[in-house]
Swiss-Prot record, chain B:
Pfam families: Ras. GTP binds at V20, G21, K22, T23, C24, T41, G67, N122, K123, D125, A153, K154. Mg(2+) binds at T23, T41, D64. This is Ras-related protein Rab-30. Gene3D superfamilies: P-loop containing nucleotide triphosphate hydrolases. It comes from Homo sapiens (Human). Belongs to the small GTPase superfamily. Rab family.
Length: 657, 203
């Protein structure tokens, strides 16, 4: 597109993560001219969600991160005047580390052939072909190799290399040429049009029945073929139904761009078993695990928590104790204590005081029933939708969007110390009054004194739920307490296909904890407790009860939350920094940061007020009576207000009558 | 206000290169006017028009790109849950036609597979400057299994027809129960999908 960017803005925002996107919407909404850019080809930065092939391309990017810089960028040095200096930005992203991908699902050659046949129906499509290469360099665990290497075309030397687990980072460059050749005919697999989906499904089912009559088999090529069905979040979060993001979505009307599903279950992991935590009144009464006495004790305790402030005598004496100590005094049986501590209050054993614990429990209970019987919501198509929705709001109010747009440096006026402009990769100078930049874009020099935390993440594709029930469409959250005191609890979120984040008959499982080591070292033990690798199945019959791992990815992500502005070197006063995703379950940090920065920049402006209702803008078209053959049309334009409310479940209070 | 003031609600989404006339098509249809000058209307998110077809009230929610196509930066979420897509090019601009396969790829990636796609060649009032022949466009749309129509937002040619035909098609698709909404509709007993959170729903 031969369209030039304007060169005068009020606010330039670099990075499309959640806080930047909220700020973009807020600024644009208050009448500022906003330019919002991202160096990547997708929205969201580390808040993004990817289709399966998209995720593989993302992985590959980190694998190849080294050879960035060949691109022709116009030198900025000549564009800086004498009275100015430049603060350069980072050339390559360094917020993701230790990526390791594993494929456990079988790589059936026959499947591939079948799909290549199907491909001919739709020769025009051509999504990127990177996935096979990535997979090849990501190593395959030994168990699944037998079927994979049935293919004669597979270079033999790969076999030696893939013993054990080799991370993507150290993929052999020499092999890639050979790999390309091998992939030549496989490349097309995932380009099979969705329009053929139904048909393909039935053919493969037939084939499956022949091969493996007992279990519904998901092969790697099925995952690839249905790759579009996946929306895999880099950061795993949920929305508290009384949380600040929900409030902001509602207030700003950005909620009209996004739909949610309830998290349907809160789970606990105790003594090697996954159990459902009864949290609503109905849950408690229907629970088969709890005895009558336990039910009564739990109900009594939860009811107390809802109004604990009114009964100070019940907890005053325990103010100085930890919440877990306090729970022991409440006649709760060990499993009830576990439920309350880990799954309801979601606090850690050691660090949480009685008051914090009671408060967390109360909050949990108050969130219940706003939208369903757990306090959490999950956005359809993944968390990555949410920043995009704020970006749309910004664009609707005139914000200009430019992905794949790299910024080389800030131009700072020496005298005032204020930033005047950016210079982009075309060498274009774009002026603005305020600049907002995501932490990951700042150079090493700027961040020299910053101490970053890390988040350990795992993404798993599995074939069954970790707790099977009548319905296979459950969305669950599970907190796995640390194995030893002092370590971090691991948060597990299991998404079903109706959240639109994974293909039918699979589950997408996210594990998150704050890092002490690499993601795999931090999370693998929990993965092993809950899942079994695909190929173990034939050998180990009792393992059949566990869901099988089809594919797994581990990575570490930088956690730049909670860094004070003064830790960054030499930031001009009108440059503001947003952090990447934090480790917390909710989005409160991002929302708070966006609001705080907005109020700092524009103290007198309202933060994200509701926009005019689009339905109010509509003109009345009654004067027009178009004639369309075959139909009897009257064109009626309407002024309506949100009748959509009927889509909502009515809020119920489960614990209070 | 009544709860049920329409029989059908469809989300229609416009895409295509910047400058082909998407915004003009929407405004011509919903407001009956051809906006003079360039400036995009600030703050208009989507336009609503309720039409009556064979006695049934059909509410069309028509979404424009908010200009994000200008630098090829449309959000994926824009495509979600669209019932129909209007892919527009400018018959006087070869480039806008050549970009169509790229748009189709984006549709395939992000839109529901049950979405109805209509190809629209706009600005037929500028016939003397035509760069893309009708035949070429017809062949292309046939190969891609799309409906094809040529319009002029300026002269109001075929604009009503475009949207009303689309509404008819959407209704018959809905009748056959193959609409997008079913894909995400929850199975019994599960959390419903929650949309349009509005203030009035709580307290
Ligand atoms: C149902 C529910 C709703 C929640 N809603 C929010 C929310 O809207 N916003 C938010 O920031 N956190 C909320 N939390 C708390 C949030 O889960 C934890 O802060 C988060 O899990 C971090 O845990 P942690 O182990 O790091 O810290 P923890 O040791 O668990 O707590 C860290 C701090 O968070 C505070 N906190 C604990 N629970 C809550 C709570 N319910 N609401 C507010 N503060 C709390 C504590 O007082 C403490 O100072 C909620 C928790 C639950 C169970
Ligand atoms: N002659 C003519 N010009 C049109 C027509 N539709 C749009 N335009 C002009 O094309 C330009 C771009 O239109 P716009 O609706 O903003 O395009 P969009 O970027 O696709 O939304 C404007 O200058 C319009 O006046 C049409 O049917 N005929
Ligand atoms: Mg437009």
């Amino acid at each position: 597109m031969a369209d030039n960017l304007p060169t005068e803005f009020d606010v330039i925002i670099i990075g499309t993560g959640l806080p930047e996107s909220i700020l973009a919407a807020a600024c644009s909404r208050s009448g500022q001219r906003v330019l919002h850019v991202d160096s990547r080809s997708y929205y969201g930065g580390n808040w993004a969600s990817f289709s399966f092939s998209g995720l593989l391309s993302w992985l590959k990017e980190y694998q190849q991160n080294n050879d960035i810089g060949e691109e022709s960028t116009v030198a900025w040095q000549d564009l800086i005047h004498e009275t100015e200096e430049a603060i350069t930005l980072r050339k390559k992203d360094e917020t993701i580390q230790h990526t390791e991908a594993f494929c456990y699902a079988s790589q059936d050659v026959e499947d591939d052939i079948e799909e290549i046949g199907a491909l001919q129906k739709n020769p025009s499509s051509g999504v990127s072909s990177t996935f096979t290469e990535v997979l090849d360099s990501a190593c395959l665990p030994e168990e699944s190799q037998s079927s994979y290497f049935n293919s004669d075309e597979m270079p033999a030397k790969h076999t030696q290399k893939s013993a054990g687990e080799i991370s993507l980072e150290i993929a052999d460059v020499d092999e890639s040429v050979e790999k390309e050749k091998y992939c030549g005919d496989k490349t097309c697999i995932h380009t099979v049009s969705d329009k053929d989906g139904v048909k393909d499904e039935s053919t493969s089912t037939v084939e499956d029945d022949a091969n493996q009559p007992n279990r519904n088999r998901i092969t790697y090529s099925k995952i690839v073929k249905e790759g579009r069905r996946f929306n895999i979040d880099l950061v795993s979060k949920l929305l508290y139904s009384q949380g600040s993001l929900i409030d902001l979505l509602i207030k700003s009307d950005v909620s009209r761009y996004v739909e949610f599903k309830n998290v349907t279950r809160i789970l606990a992991f105790r003594e090697g078993k996954v159990e459902q935590v009864p949290c609503s009144r109905a849950d408690v009464f229907n629970s088969k695990e709890l005895t009558m006495v336990e039910k009564r004790i739990l109900m009594k305790f939860l009811t107390f928590c809802l109004e604990y402030e009114q009964h100070p005598d019940e907890y005053q004496a325990f103010r100085q104790c930890s919440f877990s100590e306090y729970l022991k005094t409440k006649k709760l049986t060990p499993n009830l204590q576990h439920f309350v501590l880990h799954s309801i209050a979601m606090t850690s054993e050691s660090s949480c005081t009685t008051i914090d614990g009671l408060n967390a429990t109360k909050n949990f209970l108050q969130c219940l029933g706003r939208f369903g019987n757990t306090p959490f919501l999950f956005p359809l198509y993944g968390q990555g939708e949410i920043p995009q929705c704020f970006c749309r709001m910004c664009a609707v109010f005139g914000g200009i969007y430019c992905l794949r747009h790299k910024v080389q440096c800030f131009v700072v006026d020496k005298e005032s110390g204020r930033c005047k402009a950016i210079i982009d990769h075309f060498g274009q100078r774009i002026n603005a009054k305020y600049f907002i930049v995501e932490d990951g874009y700042l150079s090493e020099e700027t961040c020299l004194n910053v101490q970053y935390k890390q988040i350990s993440r795992a993404v798993l594709i599995t074939d069954k739920s970790i707790l099977k029930t009548d319905s296979d469409q459950q969305t669950s959250i599970l907190i796995v307490p640390p194995a030893e005191p002092g370590a971090c609890a691991v948060r597990v979120t299991e998404l079903c296909s109706s959240t639109m984040t994974c293909m039918k008959d699979t589950y997408l499982v996210h594990l998150t904890c704050s890092s002490s080591k690499t993601a795999r070292e931090d999370l693998e033990s929990v993965v092993e407790k809950l899942f079994t690798p695909y190929a173990d199945i034939e050998i180990n019959k009792e393992e059949l009860t566990k869901p099988r791992l089809l594919w797994a990815l581990y990575f570490n992500m930088r956690d730049s939350s909670g860094i004070s502005r003064s830790s960054y070197n030499g930031l001009p006063s009108n440059v503001y920094v947003c952090s990447g995703p934090d480790c917390g379950l909710g989005n409160e940090h991002a929302v708070k940061q966006a609001e705080t920065l907005f109020q700092e920049i524009f103290p007198s402006e309202e933060f994200c007020p509701p926009p005019p209702n689009p339905e109010d803008i509509i003109f009345d078209g009654d004067d027009k009576q178009p004639e369309v053959p075959g139909t009897n049309n009257t064109v009626i334009a309407k002024l309506q207000s949100s009748e959509e409310s009927k889509n909502l479940e009515s809020p119920e209070k489960h614990l209070q009558n | 206000m009544s709860m049920e003031d329409y029989d059908f609600l469809f989300k229609i989404v416009l895409i295509g290169n910047a400058g082909v006339g998407k915004t003009c098509l929407v405004r011509r249809f919903t407001q009956g006017l051809f906006p003079p000058g360039q400036g995009a209307t600030i703050g208009v998110d989507f336009m609503i028009k309720t039409v009556e077809i064979n006695g049934e009230k059909v509410k069309l929610q028509i979404w424009d790109t908010a200009g994000q196509e200008r630098f090829r930066s449309i959000t994926q979420s824009y495509y979600r849950s669209a019932n129909a897509l209007i892919l527009t090019y400018d018959i006087t601009c070869e480039e806008s036609f050549r970009c169509l396969p790229e748009w189709l790829r984006e549709i395939e990636q992000y839109a529901s597979n049950k979405v109805i796609t209509v190809l629209v060649g706009n600005k037929i009032d500028l016939a003397e400057r035509r760069e893309v022949s009708q035949q070429r466009a017809e062949e292309f749309s046939e190969a891609q299994d799309m409906y094809y129509l040529e319009t002029s937002a300026k002269e109001s040619d075929n604009v009503e027809k475009l949207f009303l035909d689309l509404a008819c098609r959407l209704i018959s698709e809905a009748r056959q129960n193959t609409l997008v909404n079913n894909v995400s509709s929850p199975l019994p007993g599960e959390g419903k999908s929650i949309s349009y959170l509005t203030c009035c729903n709580f307290n």
